Curated annotation (Swiss-Prot):
Keywords: Ribonucleoprotein, Ribosomal protein. It comes from Chaetomium thermophilum (strain DSM 1495 / CBS 144.50 / IMI 039719) (Thermochaetoides thermophila). It comes from the Eukaryota. This is Large ribosomal subunit protein uL5. Component of the ribosome, a large ribonucleoprotein complex responsible for the synthesis of proteins in the cell. The small ribosomal subunit (SSU) binds messenger RNAs (mRNAs) and translates the encoded message by selecting cognate aminoacyl-transfer RNA (tRNA) molecules. The large subunit (LSU) contains the ribosomal catalytic site termed the peptidyl transferase center (PTC), which catalyzes the formation of peptide bonds, thereby polymerizing the amino acids delivered by tRNAs into a polypeptide chain. The lineage of its organism: Eukaryota, Fungi, Dikarya, Ascomycota, Pezizomycotina. Signal peptide: none annotated. GO terms for biological process: translation. One of its GO terms (molecular function) is structural constituent of ribosome.
Length: 173
């Protein structure tokens, strides 16, 4: 047997999903152009998000479409996350990581991701949010024979930071 202890494959962290969000703050032409940006980036059809409340100072009404987002899973999520982290130079803050082990960050210009600039679309910033999981998480999500995940199997902030540093050779401040 090797000198180091064998790692349990059920304890390995993996990316469950990556959510890309562009919040425009108004419906109309700018929102549809933002949807085109997300479609170019992910290759999937984005979903529109509606405002929950009317806020007169911002000029938005309840149920008005104000944002667009897309959920990416699998190897495509890892590839897009890699491109997003390259823009941030693999450097995140500690407060980017949540207590439940997920993390998120934002970029100011989508053209940094390698998408060619199109004058008819413009430049949009976007938010990346990455949800982490472990094998066996379906036990809590499934419909039949639902059960709880033990405290030792839940993902913590420190575990995700360790995974981020090891996987992407990243810096956490």
């Amino acid at each position: 047997m090797s000198s180091e202890k064998a790692q349990n494959p059920m304890r390995e962290l993996r990316i469950q999903k990556l959510v890309l969000n562009i919040s425009v703050g108004e419906s109309g032409d700018r929102l549809t152009r933002a949807a085109k940006v997300l479609e170019q980036l992910s290759g999937q059809t984005p979903v529109y998000s509606k405002a929950r409340y009317t806020v007169r100072q911002f000029g938005i009404r309840r149920n008005e479409k104000i944002a667009v987002h897309v959920t990416v899973r699998g190897p495509k999520a890892e590839e897009i996350l890699e491109r997003g982290l390259k823009v941030k130079e693999y450097e995140l803050r500690r407060r980017n990581f949540s207590e439940t082990g997920n993390f998120g960050f934002g970029i100011s210009e989508h053209i940094d991701l390698g998408i060619k600039y199109d004058p008819s679309i413009g430049i949009y910033g976007m938010d990346f949010y990455c949800c982490m999981t472990r094998p066996g998480e379906r036990v809590a999500k499934r419909r039949r024979c639902k059960s709880r995940i033990g405290a030792s199997h839940r993902i913590t902030r420190e575990e995700t930071i360790r995974w981020f540093k090891q996987r992407f050779d990243g810096i956490v401040r």
